[in-house]
Amino acid sequence: MSAPEADPLVLFHKWMDEAEKAEPNDPNAMALATADAEGRPSVRMVLLKGADQDGFVFFTNLESRKGQELAANPHAALCLHWKSLRRQIRVEGSITRVSDEEADAYFATRARASQIGAWASIQSRPLTGRFELEKRVGEFAAKFGLGKVPRPPHWSGFRLAPRRIEFWHDRPFRLHDRFDYVRDGDGWHLEHLYP
């Protein structure tokens, strides 16, 4: 790996651009780790939908397990791993909800079937069978007909404001490169870590 950038977001976007060219499926897939109010962790894959100086954005059902955990404990970590590139990025930080306007704008870009699915899925609740879900999808499809599907009140997005971003690049004999950026006021403090 060449000398790291002073701004981790510049390096992040370079790596993401390379991942989008190299990864066949969902290069923006990331493991999102949350914890409940008692500190019990859970992790799942979600899709990164935006990254800038304000943070890393993803969208979800607010009533899901992750939504409830983020409401109770607004701290999280995410990890993007691209096996074909032998790279990984880990991010830690605090969580805030995106604005209703931002959530509405993203929701409007989703496929209609995904919009209806956001209404139909009572995410993380027990499901007696596939037919129950398909029935709910049909009910909401009939409700909205050919009209616009509004964003459900229980569906929005979160922004992880990074306080630490670590870039890992595989090297022979486990002598990997690790560059750790820690928020320092308005800038970043960079350290090269032992593998």
Curated annotation (Swiss-Prot):
EC number: 1.4.3.5
Necessary cofactors: FMN
Highest taxon above the source species: Bacteria
Catalytic reaction(s) noted: pyridoxamine 5'-phosphate + O2 + H2O = pyridoxal 5'-phosphate + H2O2 + NH4(+); pyridoxine 5'-phosphate + O2 = pyridoxal 5'-phosphate + H2O2
PROSITE patterns with a match to the protein in the record: PYRIDOX_OXIDASE
Keyword field contains Zinc: no
Positions contributing to FMN binding: 44-49, 59-60, 65-66, 88, 123-124, 168, 178
One record GO biological process: pyridoxine biosynthetic process
Record keywords: Flavoprotein, FMN, Oxidoreductase, Pyridoxine biosynthesis
Pfam families attached to this UniProt entry: PNP_phzG_C (PF10590), PNPOx_N (PF01243)
Residues annotated as binding substrate: K49, Y106, R110, S114, R174, L175, H176
GO MF term (any one): FMN binding
Function: Catalyzes the oxidation of either pyridoxine 5'-phosphate (PNP) or pyridoxamine 5'-phosphate (PMP) into pyridoxal 5'-phosphate (PLP).
Protein name from the UniProt record: Pyridoxine/pyridoxamine 5'-phosphate oxidase
Organism placement in taxonomy: Bacteria, Pseudomonadati, Pseudomonadota, Alphaproteobacteria, Rhodospirillales
Gene transcribed to yield this protein: pdxH
